[in-house]
Structure formats: structure tokens, C-alpha cells
A protein has these predicted regions:
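Active-site lumenal/periplasmic loops and adjacent helix-entry segments of GT-C-fold
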Residues: 24-124, 132-136, 140-161
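Transmembrane catalytic cores of multi-pass membrane glycosyltransferases
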Residues: 158, 181-185, 189-306
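Signature aromatic-anchored transmembrane alpha helix within multi-pass, membrane-resident enzymes
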Residues: 240-241, 346, 352-380
Length: 530
């Protein structure tokens, strides 16, 4: 009885902490009765969910709403689309904005499921310092960012599935008898779904794990290797079946951004935060993981040297093979930070196990999370400059939504806008855009950048004609010009078109008719040539 009450209290506290951190940005998501998402990719995802809602059973294999008129073959897949749609069906009896609300809450709910799973799994594994892992999972800023309110992105589902897959592999090592096969099924299913959801990080992690299993061997089949042991056959069947279903439904192999080598892609990727490099000396590591990240090499060495030939020795190898490569990948691309911190948190209880003093561990842990707490202090109580920037962003989002809604029509009236604004305009207006926020939209991104930097009339006119544009959105000319110049890797011209459209609408080219404006945006209609 007492044990059940304590478990309930633990789950309640963990759930409250996870939801409180994930929903800390609610003022930026719920604005004046409307729901806004945190970045451009989220609006692209919600447009996919919108299409599935309008035509249940649809597998979205082509994006006509970006890179118009060619469109794109996206790297995004169906699992998250239908997860959002399923959640919206549950919410429909309670709200008129079920799809938007489902998109806003899907990632925090996935984080909550991940927290519950880790609570159950770590308890089953009898980790002495399990709450170190659970607290870091709940409060790490980058894990929160990947699963926060208003961020319906594939990363949140990937993080949940990768968590389950790695924990299942870990448990399979420790299991005996029939439990070994059961954990293999869980692992194979989770890896299959994770790769279906996103064939990038999950696929690379899966390959690393399989290599690790082949190298270490298996206690049941020491001569065949763990990856091919009999106990894994059911898991492999589940994995292959899910991948086969994914290929059958998606009917395409997603393109990987790392395979792109064009100059435009390299230029554009430098403007994307999640594709940026993270220096090993960057203090953001401490904000993500706390000071314990500095002790990781020592903890791995101490764990391995303390009982080098025992069953527990497999755990440090898991940390070594997954923590170290994901750290290197994060230095290369910041988007790997989600998985580095996730795996770091999973490894911490085992890495701390050789330390026999719980008091020493908890004192060190509390001191180590000071950088994380400082980050939360800045988020919850921002200074005047940060608060003003947030308020400005909310106001701009509301203004852009107002203009976009005015474009709604049964007819197709394509628009041209800065690439990072295009997905939200497409979602609200239902009209296709020239640009987009994915690497598949590079042609449209390049043309929109050339349009805004043009100084003569012929090039922008030709771009509008080629893309059959009916509307043009003008925004802050300084930001648009700088971003466009970065994408094209060229100097800023003296009189770019974006500056004219933003600051002096009366001097706009004759084929651009000034139609509407807000404090931050201006809307131009394309004159029909006779």
C-alpha cells in the first residue's frame, strides 16, 4: 500500500516537472485565442496533418504547398501526421480548434510518455541513482526544446522511440530466458518505427548499436554475435516487417540533407540553427547537461576499471559507443544534441554506480545543474530586451496570420515570401508558396532570395512569372536582405528590392500593386499583364 502511494507520488511529481518545463512557453503559443507554433518546420508538419484530416488515409508523398509549382518530395513521413490527427479526433468534442491544439500538445505528451517509460524501466533495472537521469530528462533545456509546447516536429517522436529502443537493448543484455526475446521484440519494433519516422539520426544510432552488439558478442550465442543471436530473431522479424510496411506506404526513400553538396545548400545550412556547428568550448554544453558532462570521461574510465569483467561492464560500453559518437555528431550539427543529452542522461545512473556515497552523488548533482537552472531563470524571468523581443515576435505572428487569412480562396493564388515565413503563410492561407523551410525547397529558396536582392526589374518579373506568383509578402528589409545575401553568398546590393517593398511602397515596380499592410508586413498583388 505504502509502496503504491510512493510510486503514485513519484509519477505525479515527475509528470508535473516534465509538463511544467515543456509548457513554459505557453504565452508564445497561445496568443489572443489563437495557436502559434514555434518554427517554420512545425507549420509544414501541420499542413501535412491538415491534408490528412481533409482526406483520411492519405499518405503525403508530395508537397505542393512549397517550392511551387514543382513542389517537393519530402523527407517527412506519415507516423507523426497520423499521431497528430488521432489526438485531434480525441479533442474534437471539446474544442473547435482540435487540429491546432493536437499539434501544440503532441510533443509534450510524447515527452510525458518517455518520462513514464524511463521511470518504469529505471525502477525495473534497480538503478541506485535513477532520479539523476529522470531529473535531467525533465529539465535539460535541449530535451525540453525538442518536445516543447507548439513544436509538432518529428524529433519528439524520434526521441521517444530511440529511448525505448536503447533501453530495450540494455534490458535484453540483463535479461534471461523468455524475457530476452520479449525485449528483442520491443527493441526491433522501436527501431523500426524510429527509422520510419526519420531515417537519419535513428538509422545511424541503430547501425552503431548493431556494430556494438556484433563486437561484444552475446552471452547466449558467443560465436555468432549478439546481433544475430536466436533470441533476436523475433525482434528482427518485427523490424523488417515495419520497414517493409514503411516502404510500401511511403513509396519513396527520403533524401538525406548530408548528401547535398550544392553551394546553395551549404550557404543556406549556415543560416539554420540546428545545422550549425557546436564548439567543444561552447558553454551551451553546460546549459544542456550541467557540470557532469565535464566528468564523463573520468566516470566512464572509473566504471570500466572498477569491475572490468562482470556483467555490469556492458553498460559502460553502451555509454562509450553511443555517448562519444553523438557528442562528435553534435559538434558537427547541433540537431544531434537532442540524442547526445538523451543518451548521456540514460548512461548517468550506470556511470555513477561505482560511487558508493549517495550523499556525495546528490550534492555533486545539485551543484552540477546550476548552469541548467540559470538557463531556466533567464527563460522564466527574461530581461527587458528579451521580453520585448518575445512580445514583438508574438505581435508579428498575429499580424502575419491576419494577412495570410485574407488570401484564403478556392482558387490557387501562389505567394512569394521570405522562406522562413512561407510555411506559416501556406498553413493559414491554404495557398502554395515559392519557398519553404526544408532542403527539398532549395530552388524556391534561391529564387525568393534573388527576388528580394534584385536591383533591376527584369529578374524579379521573370521569377514571378516562372512561379506563377499572385502575391508577395514584404518583411523587415534588413533581415531579409542579410539572409538572402547569406543564402546566395553575395554582397548586399545598395538598393535591393526588399528595401523598396518594405520602406517605400509607392516606389515599388509597376507590376507590384500595394494591397495591404500591418506594422511589420506589407502585401503586394501581382498586376495582370494584358
Amino acid at each position: 500500500m505504502i509502496r503504491g502511494i510512493l510510486s503514485t507520488i513519484e509519477i505525479a511529481l515527475l509528470s508535473a516537472l516534465i509538463l511544467a518545463t515543456r509548457c513554459a512557453n505557453y504565452q508564445d503559443v497561445f496568443v489572443a485565442g489563437n495557436i502559434y507554433f514555434v518554427d517554420a518546420d512545425c507549420y509544414a508538419r501541420m499542413t501535412r496533418a491538415q491534408m490528412c484530416d481533409a482526406q483520411p488515409g492519405l499518405i503525403v508523398r508530395h508537397h505542393a504547398f512549397e517550392n511551387f509549382p514543382q513542389g517537393t518530395t519530402p523527407h517527412t513521413t506519415a507516423p507523426l501526421d497520423y499521431l497528430i490527427l488521432s489526438l485531434s479526433l480525441l479533442l474534437k468534442p471539446f474544442t473547435a480548434h482540435a487540429l491546432d491544439l493536437a499539434g501544440a500538445f503532441v510533443s509534450p505528451l510524447l515527452a510525458l510518455l518517455g518520462g513514464w517509460f524511463l521511470w518504469w524501466w529505471s525502477r525495473r533495472m534497480k538503478f541506485q541513482y535513477r532520479w539523476v537521469m529522470l531529473i535531467l530528462y525533465a529539465i535539460s533545456p535541449i530535451l525540453v526544446h525538442g518536445t516543447e509546447l507548439g513544436r509538432p516536429d518529428h524529433q519528439s517522436l524520434s526521441m521517444l522511440l530511440v529511448t525505448i529502443a536503447i533501453c530495450a537493448e540494455w534490458s535484453r543484455w540483463e535479461a534471461t530466458g523468455a524475457a530476452t526475446a520479449r525485449w528483442a521484440v520491443v527493441s526491433g519494433t522501436a527501431w523500426g518505427l524510429a527509422i520510419w519516422n526519420s531515417a537519419y539520426e535513428a538509422l545511424i544510432l541503430f547501425v552503431l548499436v548493431i556494430v556494438l552488439l556484433l563486437v561484444l558478442g552475446d552471452k547466449e550465442a558467443p560465436h555468432s554475435g549478439a546481433a544475430t543471436a536466436k533470441s533476436r530473431r523475433a525482434g528482427w522479424v518485427c523490424f523488417v516487417l515495419i520497414i517493409a510496411i514503411a516502404l510500401l506506404l511511403e513509396r519513396r526513400i527520403p533524401s538525406l540533407s548530408i548528401l547535398h553538396s550544392s553551394a546553395i545548400f551549404k550557404n543556406w545550412s549556415r543560416t539554420i540553427g540546428e545545422l550549425a556547428h557546436v564548439s567543444p568550448a561552447n558553454p551551451i554544453w553546460l546549459r544542456w547537461c550541467g557540470y557532469f558532462v565535464l566528468l564523463t570521461p573520468f566516470l566512464i574510465w572509473m566504471s570500466m576499471s572498477g569491475h572490468s569483467r562482470t556483467r555490469q561492464q556492458r553498460t559502460p560500453w553502451l555509454a562509450l559507443v553511443l555517448v562519444v559518437p553523438t557528442y562528435g555528431f553534435t559538434i558537427w550539427q547541433a540537431r544531434w544534441g537532442y540524442f547526445f543529452v538523451l543518451i548521456f542522461a540514460l548512461a548517468l545512473p550506470a556511470l555513477l554506480a561505482p560511487i558508493k556515497s549517495p550523499a556525495a552523488v546528490w550534492i555533486a548533482f545539485v551543484l552540477s545543474i546550476f548552469p541548467i537552472l540559470r538557463d531556466w531563470d533567464e527563460r522564466i524571468w527574461p530581461n527587458e530586451t528579451q521580453l520585448a523581443a518575445r512580445v514583438e515576435l508574438r505581435n508579428e505572428s498575429a499580424q502575419l496570420r491576419e494577412l495570410a487569412l485574407s488570401l484564403q480562396s478556392r482558387d490557387v493564388h501562389p505567394f512569394l515570401a521570405p522562406w522562413w515565413l512561407s510555411p506559416s503563410i501556406a498553413y493559414w492561407s491554404g495557398q502554395p508558396g515559392v519557398a519553404g523551410s526544408s532542403h527539398e525547397s532549395l530552388n524556391g529558396i534561391e529564387d525568393s532570395a534573388r527576388f528580394f536582392l534584385s536591383e533591376d526589374l527584369q529578374e524579379p518579373r521573370k521569377i514571378l512569372q516562372n512561379h506563377r506568383v499572385a502575391w508577395v509578402f514584404a518583411y523587415d528589409s534588413e533581415r531579409v536582405a542579410q539572409n538572402s545575401a547569406a543564402v546566395l553568398n553575395q554582397e548586399l546590393p545598395l538598393h535591393p528590392l526588399c528595401r523598396v517593398l518594405d520602406r517605400t511602397p509607392s516606389q515599388a515596380p509597376p507590376f507590384l500593386i500595394f494591397s495591404a499592410q500591418t506594422a511589420a508586413f506589407k502585401l503586394y498583388r501581382i498586376a495582370v499583364e494584358r
